[in-house]
Amino acid sequence: MNPFVIHTGVVAPLDRVNVDTDAIIPKQFLKRIERSGFGQFLFYEWRFTVDGAPIDSFILNTPAYKESTVLLARNNFGCGSSREHAPWALLDYGFRCVIAPSFADIFYNNCFKNGILPIKLSEEQVDELFNRAESKPNYQLTIDLQEQVVRDNEGLSYPFEVDSYRRYCLLNGLDDIGITLQYEDKIAAYEARR
């Protein structure tokens, strides 16, 4: 997993509430267990027609937002069924951070385990970010996990909270396996004594 320390990226404003995991990555694309290759199916039913043609009006199909790495969302992002494929699709597309007023718990936890930083900000703060992102194509935010702050180049600055353990894992690029491997010598010593 790649460390997340400071990230600057274009913000894609997805102005929909209750975006569920089936919208993030539809069920027909869940037939694989490897983590890569899902980005092409992200928001598939919103991005493409039934014939596979791009829907030009969808935010990620517009030129200003195709290279976005910060997703701005509304309340209850990631609700619905538990599927780790949802953060896999976001990450594979290129997103490193999702900002919203609230997240579904399982999705929120899965983001951390897969190298995506989910940030909870107030509805007022998210509204202000939507105003800026929608009025300024290529609007960028810098997310500083070390300092726990979201900034733009116009002076906006919003602090955010992250659990210290999750922060440590993201800063160091550690998933569950990476944490376990830190104790590989102790595990080997234990196994040798058995």
Swiss-Prot record:
GO terms for cellular component: 3-isopropylmalate dehydratase complex. The gene is leuD. Belongs to the LeuD family. LeuD type 1 subfamily. GO terms for biological process: L-leucine biosynthetic process. GO terms for molecular function: 3-isopropylmalate dehydratase activity. This is 3-isopropylmalate dehydratase small subunit. It comes from Brevibacillus brevis (strain 47 / JCM 6285 / NBRC 100599). Pathway: Amino-acid biosynthesis; L-leucine biosynthesis; L-leucine from 3-methyl-2-oxobutanoate: step 2/4. Keywords: Amino-acid biosynthesis, Branched-chain amino acid biosynthesis, Leucine biosynthesis, Lyase. Its EC number is 4.2.1.33.
